Structures are given as C-alpha cells and as structure tokens.
Amino acid sequence: MKILIAEDDLASRKFMHKFFSEYGECDLVVDGLEAIEAYMMSIKEEEPYDLICLDIMMPKVDGIKVLKAIKELEEKNNVLLANRAKIIMTTALGETELVKEAFELGSDAYASKPIDLKKIKQVMEKLSLIG
C-alpha cells in the first residue's frame, strides 16, 4: 500500500509514520503545498496513493483546500473511482463545520487528535485497506 501522510506537527508525523509504515510505503510532507505536489507526482508516475492521511490545519495550503485539489486532479486525470485514494482527515480541533465540509468534498473518514490507533485500524478495515 502506498500512503501519503500530510502533517505539519513533527511528533504527530513521526507517530503516524511509525504506525502506517507497518502497512506500506509512506511519503511524508509537512504542508498542504507539498501534499498537492506529492499527489500530482504520484498521478504523473502512475503510482497513485492508496491512502492519504491529511491534517486539516496545515501551513501554506490547509487540508480542506488540499482535499479539493486532490478531487479536482482525480477528475482531470480520469482516475477511476476504484483507484482513487482513500482520504482520512485529521485535526486536533473540534471544528464540526470543517469536518462536515471535508465529508461533503469527498473525505472517506475523519480522525481526531490525538490519534487513536485502534480506531484508525478500524477505519482502514472499513475502507478495505487492510483485512
């Protein structure tokens, strides 16, 4: 499985990397602009991500705008529905409006911080990423 972790907080990024690396190859980015660039590169190289873990509050470009960009790139590049990355939005905020917007834009799941690994594993099972 190919995984993109977009997280600006170093401790959270390391924590998520340690967990997700058990399931596949992880690329790490620290801001929204890098996330968009990494996604574009994965499409160009025809090695799309299976999972994107995307922080809502990031520098340069926030997670909501990154999500919009990913969905637009999927449409533009005619990425088949079955091949589209599963997206888990994360945030330490209790911003229900942002979470609602993320789901409306096509996020597959949401995880609040601090990340509960048991819940993330359940989400991955629900999304058919792991058995």
List PLM regions with ranges.
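A Lys-centered signature of the CheY-like receiver
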Residues: 112-113
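Short amphipathic alpha-helix used as the core "switch/output" element in two-component signaling
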Residues: 37, 64-83
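Helix N-cap/capping motif at the beta->alpha junctions
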Residues: 21, 28-41, 63
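Conserved acidic carboxylate
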Residues: 7
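Charged docking surfaces used in two-component/phosphorelay signaling
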Residues: 14-21
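Alpha4 helix (beta4-alpha4-beta5 surface) of REC/receiver domains from two-component response regulators
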Residues: 82-83, 94-109, 122
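Receiver (REC) domain active-site loop signature in two-component systems and cognate sites
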Residues: 58
